[in-house]
Amino acid sequence: MMYIRQRKETKPIEVSEDFPSPKEDVKLEKKLPSGCASGRFWKILSSAVGGTVALCIGLLTSVYLATLHENDLWFSNIKEVEREISFRTECGLYYSYYKQMLQAPTLLQGFHGLIYDNKTESMRTINLLQRMNIYQEVFLSVLYRVLPIQKYLEPVYFYIYTLFGLQAVYVTALYITSWLLSGTWLSGLLAALWYVTNRIDTTRVEFTIPLRENWALPFFAIQIAAITYFLRPNLQPLSERLTLLAIFVSTFLFSLTWQFNQFMMLLQALVLFILDSLDMLPAMKATWLYGIQISCLLLVCTLQFFNSMILGSLLISFNLSVLIVRKLQKNLKTGSFLTRIWKLLLHLLLVFCLTLFLNNIIKKVLNLKSDEHIFKFLKAKFGFGATRDFDANLYLCEEAFGLLPLNTFQRLSETLLFYAYMFVLVVTVVTASVVAFHNLSDSTSLKSMDQTRKRAVDLKPEAAYNLIHTILFGVLALSTMRMKYLWTSHMCVFASFGLCSSEVWELLLRLVHLCNPKRIWVLRYLVPVLTLLYLCYKSWPGVMDELSELKEFYDPDTVELMTWINSNTPRKAVFAGSMQLLAGVKLCTGRTLTNHPHYEDKSLRERTQAVYQIYAKRSPEEVHALLRSFGTDFVILEDSICYERRHHRGCRLRDLLDVANGHEMDGPGESDPDLRPADHPRFCEEIKRNLPSYAAHFTRVFQNKTFHVYKLSRNK
């Protein structure tokens, strides 16, 4: 039975100064909800404004680039053949498969034509979905055929608008990455504006629309944004899973759309390896990211009909090596400073050796030689011996694969980007060095200190990741100009993050003993705002001039050539010539090619060198036999190659062929002593004299100021 009794008297509890009294607590309870609600409201409002600005600036960038493309070519007014010719070199080759899919009677026949293609390389049937990264063209062609837009939008506009739309995604992803790092969307706005004002050095989409990197880099930027968020500490399990999904999807799409994906992700894996080794990143999160890279590559490999070049990539070998060695090498992150250093050096050596061992084993098992030209090029580029290899020299002599020109930094400095970037880089490198030393030192005493007080110098994992990322991609850009677009876009993100980062300004103010929250707040907002105002003042007149400058596509010689081929040659005719021109022939005429610009195949590289003997010192009988061995009916000679002056002596195409053939080069200057004079004159020059020995094998059927087309006789 329940009773009610008098409550026992209890002693009053002394309230500490750190805790409010009951009366004060009641007052706080009345105040907190409104304060929390107000803070939450401003946070939601700020996020809404920041998100709206991100979408707007992404769309504006897309429209801006599309307008520049239209103004430069007058794309809406030129003929279809001129539009297709404007897709130069390999861009035209990729677009031709989009066109091929649209022209196929059914989607099934279109797929069959790509899987069993016999027009891209004569006398061969190749699987284009295995050889090339063209799933994006397949996807777009399917969308165009399925969606009810044929009456309102031409296929070419659907294609280019998709690419310009991806630029909006790209800029938005850069914006979000900078916002995540700094904690303010003002940083994202500054990053996006820097990207636009440094357009010459951050993108080339407006004049190389179908290029693989223009498809891939937006997904790469999304992946970096997702990784930046994933590396934040104390994420909720649901947020972590959703972020991992975003990383997986973006990594997969990046891998699917660009053949150089494995090299970019190898640098990312190195970033993770460095941070994990220096204890600046949670080991489990690094493991997740290694696993995502491997699984995405294997999935792409499956979709590309088990492309052996993917299986033999250094990335897969490296990631497997890291995971294996880390499992075998126990207690890697314990001990004194010197002990940790020795363990780390051993770890590096084991991973490096195991990577080379696994990669060599895989390549021998698969008999993989498709990527050997890349390693020959790298070996020659970094001074590990001269080479006469035609393919390696072809890359070495291209400006795009040379060192980054110094005038790039001059242009980047005009918008203050380079100055801001170097300022932030120096501060964060010093911070990272201190943190790395702290982590590698004897951890027992330092960890006890951390339990009582926060470190004076610290670097968040997401900031550390972006720091090492920008350093490694900077080294890549400095060594190979073509890769600068990977660095300069991230440079915008990193510089804007630093200017808006409270951690960066706090560290600097501490050094001069002027640190307080108000000064930090003023600097992190005042400096970016002043920079934004300067950018608007400096760049607005130039942007207006660009938008008002109207040009027009003009290439009458190439238009005349394509029109003649369409009207005067059989549809099954086989054409030989330069890789760049033949891509246009494939797109504009649908004729069969002997070779093309997609260079990631050993047999194709050998065939290209054989076809290029038309610019070497070879007899007409030799050239005729080589061309006929590939089923050639017509050969196109270009004066711009035969009499080339763009490159210096030793880098002209005819010089590369002469050296590869063991012949002395033309023109003033010395040749290597073991090179000998050729027995025959240069074919592309001598054939124009119409001598009997040439006329017996080649008949000129077309000529203009740029091109000469010869029909091959079928006699042996």
UniProtKB/Swiss-Prot annotation:
Q: Where in the cell is it found?
A: Endoplasmic reticulum membrane
UniProt catalytic activity: L-tryptophyl-[protein] + a di-trans,poly-cis-dolichyl beta-D-mannosyl phosphate = C-alpha-D-mannosyl-L-tryptophyl-[protein] + a di-trans,poly-cis-dolichyl phosphate + H(+)
Annotated GO biological processes are: protein glycosylation
**Native organism:** Mus musculus
- Sorted alphabetically, which keywords does the UniProt record give? Endoplasmic reticulum, Glycoprotein, Glycosyltransferase, Membrane, Transferase, Transmembrane, Transmembrane helix
- Describe the task this protein carries out: C-mannosyltransferase that mediates C-mannosylation of tryptophan residues on target proteins. The reaction occurs on the luminal side of the endoplasmic reticulum and involves the transfer of a mannose unit from a dolichylphosphate mannose (Dol-P-Man) donor to an acceptor protein containing a WxxW or WxxC consensus sequence. C-mannosylates RSPO1, a Wnt signaling regulator, preferentially at the first Trp residue in the sequence WxxW. C-mannosylates the netrin receptor UNC5A, preferentially at the third tryptophan of WxxWxxWxxC sequence.
Which residues point to the Cytoplasmic side? 1-43, 183-184, 198-215, 231-239, 280-289, 324-338, 438-465, 500-522
Biological pathway:
Protein modification; protein glycosylation
Tell me the protein's name.
Answer: Protein C-mannosyl-transferase DPY19L3
**Family per similarity comment:** Belongs to the dpy-19 family.
Q: Which residues form a coiled coil?
A: none
Q: Identify the enzyme class.
A: transferase
Q: Which CDD domains does this entry report, sorted A to Z?
A: Dpy19L3 (cd20181)
Write down the intramembrane regions as start-end ranges: 185-197, 216-230
- Origin: domain of life: Eukaryota
Q: What is known of its domains?
A: The C-terminal luminal region is essential for C-mannosyltransferase activity.
